[in-house]
Amino acid sequence: MVRENGVPEVLLVHRPQYDDWSFPKGKAHEGESDEDCARREVGEETGLECVLGVRLPPVFYESRGRPKRVSYWLMEPRGGEFTPHREVDRIEWLDLDEAGERLSYDHDRDLLAAVTELL
């Protein structure tokens, strides 16, 4: 999440394998904390180094018949640069309304609503 000119924007990633738009996320390595996983996954997917802010409500959904729980934080980018790769070929900073239209999944729109309430 970043504020440009007072307008909150969120970062979305496009995953070509699924042709979807979502928030950066991923799986924790064994013994890795949720916080370290969040920083690592955002870095791997976007190339950005971020500082964690407020922890958001967990998101629960089903993927390929298995339940998923994902932890998210508001984050502030501090550096880095995106380079397209196999997992994520595009990123976009969008205002909250644009992000709601672009997101591919209802559970991500629910998370966006929680973010909107915090701002």
What residue spans do the PLM features occupy?
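N-terminal strand-loop-strand
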Residues: M1-F23
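Unchanged
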Residues: G26-A114
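Charge-dense polyanion-binding interfaces
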Residues: T116-L119
